[in-house]
Structure formats: C-alpha cells, structure tokens
C-alpha cells in the first residue's frame, strides 16, 4: 500500500471484495446448518444481497478506473473459520442457531466497520458515486445485523438457554 488515502481506500475496497466473495461461500453452509426456518431464510436472503454487494464493489472499481480484484481478507477468514468450528459442535438445535447468529453478527459487525470507513473515505475524497454505492451496502449490512438481533432476542437465545437447563431424558 502506498502512502496516499486513495491507495488505502483501494486496498480496503479489495479487502471488502474478497470478504464478500468468502461470505458467498460461507452463507449457504450457515443456512444449511440453521434449524430455525426464519434464521435459514435470513441467511439465504443475505446471500442474495451479498451477490449485490460484490456487483456494487465492481461498480466502484470501474467508476475509479481501478482493476477489479480482491486482496485476501484475513479478518473475515478468521470469523468464517470460527463459524465453521461452531457448525462442527455437537449441540442442540437451539444452541446451534444461537451460535450461528453470533457468528453471523461477528461477520456483519466486521463489514459494518469496513463499509463505514469506505463510505467516509469516498466522501472525503469526493467520490460521490462510490460513496453512494458503498452506503447502500452499509445500510444492508446494518439491516442484516438488526434482523439477526431480532431473531436472537425474539426467541432463539431463550430457547437455547431453556435447553441448557432442561433435564436430560433417556431415549
């Protein structure tokens, strides 16, 4: 990365591009592991949005006459790896769903931070079109996070807590 804000912006944009590509691979696995129909639906809906996020980033690259390419995003890779380890755990369905929500929200919070920075930098550099495109994605990431919060607080976390305290019965 060179020493100018534009260069840092492009570097961050490439990181976000790779993060979205990694999430396109991870979200179907998360949807498959989810047992709550609402959670499964939330992951599937966000997968569709994520394809749109990739397209928007490509539009930003094009608007700035920059090559469309990613840079491996170690941050999202680590978050996805943590999510994979959750899916390999032997837990009850409610706990699995609660843990999947937590993993999904970690990814959303990472993306919210990244897109917040990208929007601010784009505006500061006078890249209005890029800022608007990235703001649209930022708004969708915040909405996805809010939806996961509603699912967690709307019963999934309580069901997981109740399952943890229910007596074990022999089959």
List PLM regions with ranges:
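Amphipathic alpha-helical hairpins
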Residues: 1-171
